[in-house]
Amino acid sequence: MLNLFAAFKKDRIWDFDGGIHPPEMKTQSSGVPLRTAPLPDKFIIPLQQHLGPEGELCVKVGDTVLKGQPLTVGRGRTVPVHAPTSGTISAITPHITAHPSGLAELCVIIQPDGEDRWCERAPVADYRQLTASELIQRIHQAGIAGLGGAGFPTASKLQGGMNGVETLILNAAECEPYITADDRLMQEHADQVIEGTQILRHLLQPKVTLIGIEDNKPEAIAALKLALRGQPGIALRVIPTKYPSGGAKQLTKILIGKEVPHGKHSSAIGVLMQNVGTAFAIKRAIVDGEPLIERVVTLTGEALSLPGNLWARIGTPVQHLLKFAGFQPQAQQMVVMGGPLMGFTLPALHVPIVKISNCILAPSVSEMAPQEQEQSCIRCGLCVDACPAGLLPQQLYWFSRGEEHEKARNHNLFDCIECGACAFVCPSNIPLVQYYRQEKAEIKAIDLEAARTAEAKARYEAKLARLEREKLAREERHKKAAVKLTDGDQDAVQAALARVRSKNAVPATGTISGDAPDNSEMNAAREARKAQARERRAQQETPVAPVTASASEDEDPRKAAVAAALARVKAKKAAPQATAVETPAESPAVVTEEDPRKAAVAAALARVKAKKAAQQATAVETPAESPAVVTEEDPRKAAVAAALARVKAKKAAQQATAVETPAESPAVVTEEDPRKAAVAAAIARAKAKRAAQSLTTADTDKE
């Protein structure tokens, strides 16, 4: 480090590889003093004039604005733009701007009122009283971007260099042919350039401050030396004229002998570089309180009768400046914004001047011939020798034409500074820089699409993760809410299950109890038909004595007595069965529900048995002459039948008692009663049929 400082004291400089020596063509405009261009009929102010996103509009159509009033606001790399004069906003619309693509961008159109009235300004008498953050904020609000051509936001650049800056370099090389804007600015305003440099030194606190200027600017060198008298800490370095010595990496190598690493900026090695025009704009913003609304623009070329350098307001149409400089268009006339090597041909003359516009070149046909026809590459290697970045332009050309993006990237395409030295020496007239610019744009578009895809994928994965977390959280809440059931809860569950079972059993009970009457009626009808058939056979086999009306009337009481006896027997049978299946006296509702059906069954059975008894009585009774005998036998048969009925009723009662549940659980008995009652009724019917058959047999034997 000590040897490096010793070299600085000895005014030592280094050299960079490559480079060319094109015709300078600077004398056309360097000897003419600065002039101020008149106000145009309208100003076209693009919202984006820097490297970064455009700001947010803070005005609308119809608003009246003053000179220096902000038109947009922004933070970070978003640099605001200001009104170049007082007037009225007539439109906010897309307009073609100073860009090689010729695409339209959003612009603010201002109709000047001719008064040129300033807005309220806030000058600072002593910038040393301000903190670093206050100085950076003022620089940002003034809308200052790099005036050397890159357009990087100055405030962001200074903010990033607050720590670790050892060397501050002021770039005054202005190496490209024709351009003399910085030269003329240093000749006439060297003291303000140095004052802006002192503000940067106060802000960054570098160890060394260097000004690099080419030796083809003797007047500017003299003016700077005069302004540096009594200004310690700033050293002036005069370097040989060589293109592109004004490049950031190249000038860094020339002044301090260090090379910037691949893919990095000068700040990576502790160097921060600013253009002399940017230093002048910083002085005006801090000391005078004026935003960046004008800059020095070189108007040169043989098609202009009054070439020189002008103070041009931002937003002034190029056509207005050319008219002021005596533009005399020729056949196949071209107008270039920038220098002949790094500039581009304007698609139209009504494009506006922006913050990075340093030159308008209007050459004659003899001065700059149109682009010759492109030939095939002969692999001469001259482009490799001329490249100041140490690249392989020939290989990059093939990769660009073949759209081999990854190979172009791997061969450090983005280290190309687009100086145009390779195209200048190419004998095949290949516009190499155009291929490189197109390839860079395509790679950036691919990277942007890949970034969007990755962002979308990240959002999708984040959504899935969020849904999974919510699912786990729900499950955890459910686990915490699920507590162990207590005994009381178990009782409640069992009660609910019992209610469900009782509801399910009700339809089955109704079906069983409902089917019994239907089946009984069918059986009764069948038995009735059989009885009628037997009666007809009996009438055919047994002679019937004539019976008078009085005799028929005498027989009716006997038949009624037999029917009554049978009914009493059936009633006695039904009574024990009903007692066996009915619920205790505490639930009379159940008995009430079952009584009608059982009564219907009993009535049907009684009718059938009465018919049978009538037939049997008719078959065994004697002729009408002996009615007393019949009358004497009927009570005996009734007594026998009654005795048999009582025996069967006792058996049925015992069976029903054996299967019924204890009286202590009436709820269970109630649930089982319908089925057991149906079974008991079927058994009773079978027993009654057998008893009737036995009784009939016994009566026959006795006769």
Curated annotation (Swiss-Prot):
Gene3D superfamilies: 3.30.70.20, NADH-ubiquinone oxidoreductase 51kDa subunit. Residues 505-558, 653-674 are annotated as: Disordered. It is an enzyme of class 7 (translocase). It is a peripheral membrane protein. Residues 524-539 have a biased composition (Basic and acidic residues). It comes from the Bacteria. GO terms for molecular function: 4 iron, 4 sulfur cluster binding; electron transfer activity; metal ion binding. Disulfide bonds: none annotated. HAMAP family: RsxC_RnfC (MF_00461). Belongs to the 4Fe4S bacterial-type ferredoxin family. RnfC subfamily. This is Ion-translocating oxidoreductase complex subunit C. It comes from Serratia proteamaculans (strain 568). The gene is rnfC.
